[in-house]
Amino acid sequence: LNKQVLKQIKSLKPGSLIRVDWHDASIGKSLSGGRTGIDVPVFSIGIFIGLLGENDKHIILGQNHFRYADGIFDIDYTAIPLVWGVNVKVIQVEYISREEAQQLLNSFLLGGRRTLPKRLKRQERLRNHHDRLD
């Protein structure tokens, strides 16, 4: 575990816009480069939602936040295993308000336990149809 990353994460406030440098998992063959091809550097930028996970802690970054009329969000997120983190850079503290950050966290924690109204299911069908056109 990178103790510097843990220290950086513990000082973050939910709602801050951050960049996380990390190394992704990789697949390869021993004849295709061996040890030099193992590290896959990645950086992700998003709104810090929290450090979550039952077994292993993950840095949760929200990228796209779809707000519905009832104040619940559907969130596109990246979950980066804490142990894969290399560096964290704060771009802007409290990029969104504390209240909105709390709404994002609450929506994230609701997960699949919430059913969306039929009108949103229709919207989802339209979005899926659009994806097939690409």
PLM features per residue range, with description:
Residues 2-134:
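Conserved RNA-binding domains used in RNP assembly and mRNA/RNA metabolism
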